[in-house]
């Protein structure tokens, strides 16, 4: 039997290893298809990232513009409604400046300023107290973050500079140690200078402080700080005085025209006999002491006069003061019968008298009737388009415990039920009806028929009581509990219906339901 040489077969089966010669050149690297595609798409990715960045910046800019215009719109609304914040006048005034340098992309076309006019920024800042100045300084920081217009940014820079200067003045006094002696001289030198002259002087002082020349550093530093305040004042005068003077001249011409027109009307008017009201003098003012809020503190005469003089000086130094114009066009109203006392004074005098009566009666169950006036239930204009007057009123609601079957079952005298309405006292004022022989009336209006047999319902029905006087007054309506009235003439708490000296009085209580206990 023949055997093969296994070693030879093994060696023959092994693959022959080939070694590359050292002298042979290495292979050249060829990138894969994936790397080639990545290198090819890299410019596209960069362009997409740049486009995304531009889109993000555009959105942020649009958002800032939206928030900035919303700030302006809210300020205009508050000014129209006479509830403005300290920053509002400064904000609206800068947007009313004419010229393309103060406007971007026609933004003023989207803003309705209405009757809001420009204010003198210097007068506005001088009229505010320390706490108002602090609020203005905080608000300016928020505005500067949203602002993009360079002219308005410069404006806010100097407004904030002046506000901070006044705040510092209120804290440590107008001048520090170095300037107390020469305060008048500093004001005499800096006040007349223009904005450009103050800029030159500021540069000279800064150069002097940086030099090695011996000098009184405290004096020059304090002078530099004072110069910033005068520089801000000079900038605001330079920026606004021309436009404010134009508006002032226009207002002067309008007032002259109106004065001539009024004088012509007065010359054509005939003398008319005026009817005067007889208002009794308050005999016992001390009885109103309980109605005066305790938080009201007396003011010293000297402090009051100083504050008044400060306001007078601010008005005198103002270039232009806008006139407060109503936001809505005033409709014609009927003439009053008297020029001696108006509706408000008549109402105040009679409210004081009624308050004294209620204090003397010591009825703890009475409260002022609030929130029961029914809107939209009356005609406010007559056939000729003349606005009717809404009468003033002073109403009281009478409260007390009601021991019906439900309350007897769930409450006792130690733990009483909630107080329920037991009656009303209506006092409506009609001063123009004095001496006319006319008296107002009232009527009850129900939306559904009253069910007299239902005495167990826990929810009281309501109805409307309407007071009618005719022209020049509107009807006036109130929502009241619909229960049967007690017409008995009891002293103090009985039924009363009268019209005396221009006051309609309607006092009544509800009938009581008696239950055995």
From Swiss-Prot:
Matches recorded under InterPro entries: Cactin_C, Cactin_central
Domain of life: Eukaryota
Cellular compartments per GO CC: catalytic step 2 spliceosome; cytoplasm; spliceosomal complex
Record's compositionally biased regions (Low complexity): 22-32
Region feature Disordered, mapped onto this chain: 1-59
A biological process term (GO) from this entry: mRNA cis splicing, via spliceosome
Quaternary organization: Interacts with sde2. Interacts with cdc5.
Function: Plays a role in pre-mRNA splicing by facilitating excision of introns featuring long spacing between the branchpoint and 3'-splice site (ss). Recruited to the spliceosome by sde2, which may enable folding of the RNA between the BP and 3'-ss to guide the splice site towards the spliceosome's catalytic center. Assists the splicing of several components involved in chromatin organization.
Protein name: Splicing factor cactin
Gene coding for it: cay1
